[in-house]
């Protein structure tokens, strides 16, 4: 059973603001590691506190915050930001 990747409107808005090389790096990483995966938690780290149901993926100096919906086999990308701004 393979997972698909979907994006929230906030995540799409964040992606549009990125420089082209950074955008290509993040898209390439998502295609390589998340699209079609059977183990979406393998490359990420579970968050704690008020974001305990979300997962974080490191891509260079950027972070991808996602919800993993096992019953739908969907990885929902919630936020993409530079590491200095993502948790604020």
Task: State each model region's role.
Residues 2-4, 9, 13, 17, ...:
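Enriched for short, Lys/Arg-rich terminal
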Residues 17-20, 36:
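Secondary-structure boundary motif
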Residues 20-23, 52:
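Intrinsic disorder/low-complexity segments in short proteins, especially the signal peptide
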Residues 31-56:
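A short, surface-exposed loop/turn module that caps and links secondary-structure elements
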């Amino acid at each position: 059973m393979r997972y698909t990747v979907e994006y929230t409107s906030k995540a799409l808005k964040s992606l549009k603001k990125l420089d082209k090389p950074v955008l290509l790096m993040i898209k390439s990483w998502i295609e390589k590691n998340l699209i079609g995966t059977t183990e979406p938690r393998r490359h990420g780290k579970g968050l704690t506190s008020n974001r305990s149901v979300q997962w974080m993926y490191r891509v260079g100096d950027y972070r991808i915050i996602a919800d993993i919906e096992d019953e739908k086999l969907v990885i929902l990308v919630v936020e993409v930001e530079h590491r200095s701004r993502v948790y604020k």
